[in-house]
Regions:
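NAD(P)+-binding Rossmann beta1-loop-alpha1 motif at the extreme N-terminus of oxidoreductases
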Residues: 1-53
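A structural signal for isolated positions on well-ordered beta-strands in alpha/beta enzyme cores
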Residues: 4, 26-28, 99, 120, ...
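Short active-site oxyanion
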Residues: 25-28, 69-72, 94-98, 143-144, ...
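Generic preference for hydrophobic
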Residues: 29, 60-62, 146-148
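Short, charged/polar "capping" segments at the starts of alpha-helices
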Residues: 35-39, 107-109, 153-154
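Rossmann-like NAD(P)(H) cofactor-binding subdomain of soluble oxidoreductases
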Residues: 52-137
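Internal alpha-helical scaffold of NAD(P)-dependent oxidoreductase catalytic cores
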Residues: 91, 113-118, 135-236
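NAD(P)-dependent Rossmann-like dehydrogenase/reductase catalytic/cofactor-binding core
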Residues: 212, 216-219, 223-344
Length: 344
């Protein structure tokens, strides 16, 4: 099986190390980051899982050189994802397919653009960080989620991903991706704004309040589009987690307890958006919180917390702000002002 991994950041690097050397699999990593390429050439790609290290030497190339590909795992940021697919489409084998790993709904957009025979969206429930170029740490274990079904290329995608981490099938990948968006838009954005790790965010009562406020706006935007959030695994029902307690949601004490447990599991995970800001790269804010704002607008719903997040991250992208914990105070001030303005 001829496989390409596009991107060698925290997700792509872990995927590459886990797939390297698998029997019957020819792996190629498409990467344009010169620091990662230099590190890989010097010492290979290195992955730490607990106290154990793995090293893989795989070719890192700036452009495809050996096709056709039976599978292309898209591990890059959502920015430019469709352009990447259009560039690589001629390099796919007749039954080849793209596998998406991004947060947000970018995978669903690609299914609409290229068809279900060419695109398999997945939901990633494990976490990783790139601690230095070409050096990775698995910060939280978990499976890939795929839509249940037998239509090709789903069995092939399942077989490939199961060589990396366990795969679970779900009845509705759209609901799962919206559910993951409710979590990632909160933790990822707040981690970028504050510079805090996920465990630090969830340990703070105010941090948990903000996580819930952002997630509740995602819940309302999804429901307005006819999507009911569902199970994410680990006992977390995203709908009940974000729905008001008086309408069938968990009581506030249980929500805060679940967040503390979630934060503990992902305590070492840093926001990928924070990494983009530190490197002076565009973030995925438009594909996460920006998507929520647009969906809420279409439904005539307010989304002050997600809108304020977009404002602050935009200012950080322009160099007007730096990641720091005090930014959370400004976020709360702006969101509260927007709420008051909408209520008038």
């Amino acid at each position: 099986m001829n496989v390409a991994v596009v991107g060698c950041g925290s997700l792509g690097g872990v995927i590459a190390v886990r797939l390297a050397g698998r029997q019957g699999l020819h792996l190629q990593v498409l990467n344009r980051n010169s620091l990662i390429a230099e590190a890989a050439s010097r010492q290979g790609l290195r992955l730490r899982v607990g106290g154990r290290w793995s090293t893989a030497r795989v070719p890192l190339l700036p452009a495809p050189s050996r096709g056709p590909y039976d599978a292309v795992i898209l591990a890059q940021k959502a920015n430019g994802l469709e352009r990447t697919c259009r560039e690589l489409l001629p390099a796919l084998a007749p039954r080849g397919f793209f596998l998406t790993t991004q947060n947000g709904l970018a995978g669903l957009e690609l299914v609409r653009a290229f068809g279900p025979a060419r695109v398999v969206p997945s939901c990633v429930l494990w976490g990783a960080s790139m601690t230095s170029p070409g050096v990775y740490e698995l910060t939280a274990s978990g499976p890939f989620l795929l839509q249940a079904g037998e239509a090709s290329p789903l069995p092939e995608a399942r077989a490939l991903l199961s060589q990396i981490f366990p795969v679970r099938l779900c009845p509705d990948i759209t609901a799962v991706l919206w559910s993951k968006l409710a979590i990632s838009a909160s933790f990822t954005a707040l981690g970028a704004i504050s510079g805090l790790r996920f465990g630090q965010l969830a340990a703070s009562p105010e941090g948990r309040r903000m996580i819930l406020a952002i997630g509740e706006e995602v819940f309302r935007a999804a429901r307005a589009q006819g999507v009911e959030l569902g199970e994410l695994g680990g006992g977390l029902n995203a709908r009940r987690f974000l729905q008001p307690a008086g309408q069938g949601g968990y009581p506030p004490t249980r929500k805060h307890l679940l967040l503390r447990l979630m934060g503990w599991k992902h305590r070492r995970t840093e926001s990928s958006m924070l990494d983009s800001l530190r490197r002076g790269r565009p973030t995925e804010i438009d594909f996460l919180n920006g998507l929520v704002v647009r969906a809420a607008e279409q439904a005539g719903l307010p989304a002050p917390w997600n809108r304020a997040v977009c404002q602050l991250v935009g200012e950080m992208e322009r160099g007007l702000l730096q990641p720091q914990e005090s930014n959370l105070i400004e976020l709360g001030r702006r969101a509260t002002a927007m709420q008051a303005g909408h209520a008038r």
